[in-house]
Each structure stands twice: as structure tokens, then as C-alpha cells.
């Protein structure tokens, strides 16, 4: 029985899933918008939102926690130097999911996941 089990399996084992979401979270922080399947985007929210909340309070302990979750110093620096201050006044809801049709090969539902309030330069680069 699967009582109280949350999260999607996505036909992967736990280490593959953990690595995939670590990489996707890094990509989302770096580019501020990525295109992926809708279920992955919905699950990625559960990884990225706590990271940004962590980055709102800059401390050595929080930086180490963020590094443990991302394994990338450049991502940690962007989280704490740019994204944390940007979302200081926002109480959650840092991401937006936009549906964008279906993938040609397997008809999987696709979506963009983006950080809200991202600067116009990042929006132009995404187009």
C-alpha cells in the first residue's frame, strides 16, 4: 500500500531521480527558464522552491545546505547573491509553469518552468 507516499517516481530509481532533479534545479537557477515534461516540471517545483527560500537568509550553514543539494558553487553563488535578495519580499511561489503543447516523438505533455520576476534580459535570451 502506498499510504502517505508523496512525489512522482517517473520510472526511475531514487538515485537517478535525485541526480536528475539536482541537474534540472541547477539548470533552472542558471538559465531561469527551462523546457521539460509537465510531470517533471511539477516535481521540480518541490526541489527549487525550498532552495530559493533557503537563499533568502545568507549564512554559512545555509550555503553549505544549498551546496549539499546542488553540488555546484556557481549555482550557490547565484542563489544567495541574486535570487535570494530578488525574492526577499515574496513568500513562496517563485516558479511558474507554462504548458507548451506535446512532444513530437512520444506526445508527452511539455511545459516551460520559469522563475517569476526574472529580468527582461533573461526573457530575451530565452526566445
Swiss-Prot record:
GO cellular component terms attached to this protein's record: cytosolic large ribosomal subunit
Keyword Ribonucleoprotein applies: yes
SUPFAM superfamilies listed in its UniProt record: Prokaryotic ribosomal protein L17
Record Gene3D superfamilies: Ribosomal protein L17
One GO-annotated biological process of the protein: translation
InterPro entries for the chain: Ribosomal_bL17, Ribosomal_bL17_CS, Ribosomal_bL17_sf
PROSITE patterns xref list: RIBOSOMAL_L17
Family per record: Belongs to the bacterial ribosomal protein bL17 family.
Subunit field text: Part of the 50S ribosomal subunit. Contacts protein L32.
Protein name: Large ribosomal subunit protein bL17
Originating organism: Aeromonas hydrophila subsp. hydrophila (strain ATCC 7966 / DSM 30187 / BCRC 13018 / CCUG 14551 / JCM 1027 / KCTC 2358 / NCIMB 9240 / NCTC 8049)
Gene assigned in the entry: rplQ
Amino acid at each position: 500500500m502506498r499510504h502517505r507516499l508523496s512525489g512522482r517516481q517517473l520510472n526511475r530509481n531514487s538515485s537517478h531521480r535525485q541526480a536528475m532533479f539536482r541537474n534540472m534545479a541547477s539548470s533552472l537557477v542558471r538559465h531561469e527558464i527551462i523546457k521539460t515534461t509537465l510531470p517533471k516540471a511539477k516535481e521540480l517545483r518541490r526541489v527549487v522552491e525550498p532552495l530559493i527560500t533557503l537563499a533568502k537568509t545568507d549564512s554559512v550553514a545555509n550555503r553549505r545546505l544549498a551546496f549539499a543539494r546542488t553540488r555546484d558553487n556557481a549555482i550557490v553563488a547565484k542563489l544567495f547573491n541574486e535570487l535570494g535578495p530578488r525574492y526577499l519580499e515574496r513568500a513562496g511561489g517563485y516558479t511558474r509553469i507554462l504548458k507548451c503543447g506535446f512532444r513530437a516523438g512520444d506526445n508527452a505533455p511539455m511545459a516551460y518552468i520559469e522563475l517569476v520576476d526574472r529580468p527582461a534580459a533573461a526573457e530575451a535570451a530565452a526566445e
